UniProtKB/Swiss-Prot annotation:
Disulfide bonds: none annotated. Binds the lower part of the 30S subunit head. One of its GO terms (biological process) is translation. It comes from the Archaea. Keywords: Ribonucleoprotein, Ribosomal protein, RNA-binding, rRNA-binding. Residues 18-87 form the KH type-2 domain. It comes from Thermofilum pendens (strain DSM 2475 / Hrk 5). SUPFAM superfamilies: Prokaryotic type KH domain (KH-domain type II), Ribosomal protein S3 C-terminal domain. Part of the 30S ribosomal subunit. This is Small ribosomal subunit protein uS3. Belongs to the universal ribosomal protein uS3 family. Signal peptide: none annotated.
Length: 202
């Protein structure tokens, strides 16, 4: 294996560990993902979250603490953290999965939690959405329930390019539950053909 390949793999593993750390620390802030860019003076870190204020913390205390951990534990040189609020949050699979999971924690029945989320997603303009909840839903046996609205492609270019997907796990009294959300974005399908009106001449 070449030195370049090793470097790429090492960097990929580091970013995966960084993402897992930020996910744990910023779950209440509806953390979605982060980007890392090398700069002449250090590393620029862009954190995308649903509630930026919880990332920053009171007087910036939380974001300063995170920066210290990134530098000390992960070797990120002089991290400069910016926080970006995720737009159109009802169309973001990760944030909607968080919302369903929190509803389950509050004791909302899983069907109601899923249907409320589906209504919000479709009202926001999605072409389709799918929510899968797994765990001990109504008994001591583990099972899975799926709720779908509209059209959500499973494969091909639409499934890869136009579907946002996320999974969130939450620990309840009966055990671990999984919430998977897939959202078909309100975009034109690749095979959509627009037929314009024909003007007759003569």
């Amino acid at each position: 294996m070449s030195t370049t390949a090793r470097k790429v793999i090492s960097q990929g593993l580091q970013y995966m560990m960084l993402n897992e750390y930020l996910q744990r620390q910023l779950v209440r802030a509806n953390y979605v993902h982060a980007q890392f860019f090398k700069t002449p003076i250090g590393t620029k870190v862009i954190v995308y979250a649903g509630v930026p204020g919880l990332v920053i913390g009171r007087k910036g205390a939380n974001i300063k603490a995170i920066a210290e951990v990134l530098e000390r534990e992960f070797g990120i040189e002089n991290p400069q953290i910016d926080v970006v609020e995720v737009p159109n949050q009802d169309l973001n699979a990760k944030i909607m999965a968080y919302r369903v999971a929190r509803a389950l924690v509050r004791g909302v029945r899983f069907r109601r939690a899923a249907l409320v989320a589906l209504n919000r997603i479709m009202a926001a303009g999605a072409r389709g959405a799918e929510i899968v909840i797994s765990g001990k839903l109504t008994s001591q046996r583990h099972r899975t329930e799926k709720f779908t609205r509209g059209y959500v492609p499973k494969s091909g270019e639409p499934g890869e390019e136009l579907v946002d997907e996320a999974i969130v796990h939450v620990l309840l009294k009966l055990g671990m539950y999984g919430v998977k959300v897939r959202i078909m974005k309100p975009a034109k399908m690749p095979d959509t053909i627009l037929i314009k009106g024909v003007t007759q001449v003569g």
